[in-house]
Regions:
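Conserved PLP-enzyme active-site core in the AAT-like
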Residues: 1-185
Length: 185
């Protein structure tokens, strides 16, 4: 939205849909817009998109224009952890952001996830010694985040432990099954 803080700081460029009735993303239009506008970052994420995103296709587009690839997985993080939804990092994305509540079933909070020692995709490897996680850490702490709440950290650890259990896969499958039932009702 144009009045948000991020809209005042950044120039967001949107891509179209194949069909307004279905709301399906037009990846060809996304490609054309990326070639035209040469974005520094492509953000893939959604709250109300009822389909799986084609992370590989988005990664191909982003790699061609040299953009950082970031996926907002807040609504589907538990489905990814449960193995029923694709992990954007496996398709070539550099960064994922998520909440720790919603489908992860933890306390309110957030995460920024990278592939470990990923290089800075905005610079040639021989021209930088800083990797992407270091750059993100420097921007987030201490300016935006500091003074951790140990009770929240402990609660998140419990939620992450639960997400590693076999029963969590059953939960993720049931979420998908329930969603499909609601969609056909």
């Amino acid at each position: 939205h144009p009045i948000t803080g991020s809209a005042k700081l950044y120039n967001f460029v949107r891509y179209g849909m194949k069909d307004v009735e279905t709301g399906e993303i037009d990846y060809d239009a996304m490609y054309e817009e990326a070639i035209k506008s040469k974005p520094k970052i492509i953000i893939a994420g959604y709250s109300g998109y009822p389909r799986n995103l084609d992370y590989k296709k988005i990664a191909e587009i982003g790699n061609e224009v040299g953009a950082v690839l970031m996926a907002d997985i807040a609504h589907i993080a538990g489905l990814i952890a449960g193995g029923v939804s694709d992990n954007p990092l496996h398709s070539g994305f550099h960064v994922m952001t998520t909440t720790t509540h919603k489908t992860l079933r933890g306390p309110r909070g957030g995460l920024i996830i990278t592939k470990g020692n990923a290089g800075n995709p905005l610079k040639a490897p021989d021209k930088t010694i800083e990797n992407l996680p270091t750059l993100i850490d420097r921007e987030v702490f201490p300016g935006f985040q500091g003074g951790p709440h140990m009770n929240n950290i402990a609660a998140k650890a419990v939620a992450f432990h639960e997400a590693l259990q076999p029963e969590f896969k059953d939960y993720a499958k049931q979420v998908v099954k329930n969603s499909q039932s609601l969609a056909t009702a």
